[in-house]
A protein has these predicted regions:
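Active-site cores that bind ATP or allylic diphosphates and position pyrophosphate for catalysis
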Residues: 1-396
Length: 396
């Protein structure tokens, strides 16, 4: 099986031993507390679940700046996006060597982790802007990632953490949320060697379904891991529970048995396009996948990125040997009325735009909200029904 990124063995930061975890929770009650923002809490979940292996905590300012500018930590580890804990007001933890990190997304703000504080560093507006420009490729405050990142605070708290809770994900998504270690173990138990990861923050339609089939066939893969984002998205996106239902229904009806694992991870979408695509590759390698499907406008939003920027970054910015995972580059997939099947649009000749069934996300949402099923060439009827029920309930 493919090795984790940056180490021989996966090292999740979640404290699995019950007794040790209880002791740390008791200790945390008397430590100075820091209520995390949602972005830092998402980072803690990913660190705890082993997805951000081999990191041992939040980056310091030198590492964060170097990762943003050069895609490497100061010690030379390849990493695409700063993993940071930015704070607006650090006065409550000033001078503390050890602190409790509290969960902003769960009632009562329970302890998520215990942190050994290395430093609390002031971050200038110029440094925040430099990082935002490098990560997102823009400083437009309308960009959802930029809007979030630039408001997180100007104090960077760095240090190693021991994770004591994976937030609400295990309770809310018991059948879907999985740690990198759990997925890696499941892949090993199935005896899969060549494994394709499919990233999604949306319900899967015919084009996505066929893309997974194509990747499996062309790579002669043993299976696909559909890995859905369960954390925070932007306003108007479909909730994780509805997406989960749609994907499970599609897999149940339209994939051969025992060829697909449906799983999810707890992270907030960055909408960082190319940089986020590389981060996706890092943590799919950590969970044991040999390939990642990267499609058109992967992890993008609006018109901020070129359609294939998330593919070209792997050739242009990722040094040879930095990652073991391979990328399966995909063009836009759509149903061809000429060929009566889903195709990659760049692979068929004698087609004009009118020969494909193409619907924008806005158009699909409008149809579903009006109780109109998209054509079966675009969405499986069983999936469309789940979505129509959701939209009509929302508008009731």
């Amino acid at each position: 099986m493919i090795k984790p990124h940056g180490s021989a063995l996966l090292n999740p930061l979640f404290v699995a031993d019950d007794q040790e975890r209880q002791q740390l929770l008791l200790e945390a009650e008397i430590l100075p507390s820091l209520l995390l923002n949602s972005a830092a809490a998402a980072n803690a979940v990913m660190l705890g679940a082993g997805y951000f292996n081999p990191l041992t905590g939040y980056m310091n300012l030198a590492d964060a700046l170097n990762v943003a500018a050069n895609l490497h930590t100061t010690e030379g580890l390849f990493w695409p996006v700063p993993i940071v804990n930015l704070v607006v007001d650090p006065s409550g933890i000033k001078g503390a060597n050890r602190i409790a990190l509290r969960d902003p997304n769960t009632d009562g703000h329970p302890v998520m982790a215990v942190m050994d504080v290395d430093a609390i560093e002031a971050v200038s507006d110029e440094q925040i802007e430099m990082m935002a420009q490098e990560i997102f490729g823009t400083l437009d405050p309308e960009h959802p990632g930029v809007g979030t990142f630039t408001q997180l605070g100007r104090n960077l708290v760095s240090g190693n953490i021991r994770v004591l809770s994976l937030s609400y994900f295990q309770a809310d998504f018991p059948d879907t949320f999985r740690t990198a270690a759990e997925i890696r173990n499941d892949i090993a138990q199935r005896g899969w060697q060549k494994v394709v990861a499919f990233q999604t923050r949306n319900p899967m339609h015919r084009a996505h379904e066929e893309l997974c089939h194509m990747a499996m066939k062309r790579l002669e893969a043993d299976g696909v891991v559909v890995h859905m984002l369960l954390g925070k998205l932007k306003q108007g996106d479909i909730p994780a529970s509805v997406r989960d239902d749609c994907i499970r229904k599609m897999v149940e009806l339209y994939f051969p048995e025992n060829t697909v694992m449906v799983t999810g991870y707890g992270f907030d979408m960055l909408y960082a396009g190319p940089r986020e695509a590389v981060l996706h590759a890092v943590f799919r390698q950590n969970m044991g996948c040999s390939h990642l499907i990267v499609g058109r406008d992967h992890a993008g939003v609006g018109d901020y990125y070129g359609a294939f920027d998330a593919q070209t970054i792997f050739a242009e910015k990722v040094p040879a040997g930095a990652l073991d995972i391979a990328i399966f580059n995909a063009d836009h997939t759509a149903f061809s009325t000429k060929l009566n099947r889903v195709v990659m649009m760049n692979e068929v000749e004698d087609h004009s735009k009118e020969d494909f069934i193409l619907l924008s996300g806005t158009k699909v949402r409008q149809m579903l909200g009006d109780g109109i099923a998209p054509p079966p060439e675009f969405a499986r009827p069983e999936v469309a029904k789940i979505l129509m029920d959701y939209y009509q309930q929302e508008s009731a």
